[in-house]
Amino acid sequence: MHEYSIVSALIEQCEQHAQANHADKITRVDIKLGVMSGVEPSLLQTAFDTFKLDGICNAAQLNIQIQPLVILCQDCQTESVLSERTVVCPACQSFRTRVLDGEDMLLMQLEMEQNED
């Protein structure tokens, strides 16, 4: 299950941001997950809940925004937003399309807290 290695890298990235901002705690992690990313949201959530226990993210809530697939047809120049995993243009049925969005997983926002000593 590659979700474990993805979550490990995500938590490491969160820890780096927290350290750079002198934060002691991360309370929320917002990510954008493309439908073509190859990552299963429920497995990602389970992996996050498991890995967060031993670090600065232990109280963090993971919010996953699913990013639909956005394609541009090279034949008819139609830009389409698709919720399913297909690269066929719905306007002209061409396979000559380019993916514009929906393939990545991106860290969008962190909510952090600092102790006031």
UniProtKB/Swiss-Prot annotation:
Ni(2+) binds at residue 2. Keywords: Metal-binding, Nickel, Zinc. Coiled coil: none annotated. One of its GO terms (biological process) is protein modification process. Gene3D superfamilies: 3.30.2320.80. Pfam families: HypA. Zn(2+) binds at residues 73, 76, 89, 92. The keyword Zinc applies. GO terms for molecular function: nickel cation binding; zinc ion binding. InterPro entries: HypA/HybF (IPR000688). Belongs to the HypA/HybF family. Involved in the maturation of [NiFe] hydrogenases. Required for nickel insertion into the metal center of the hydrogenase. HAMAP family: HypA_HybF. This is Hydrogenase maturation factor HypA. It comes from Shewanella baltica (strain OS195).
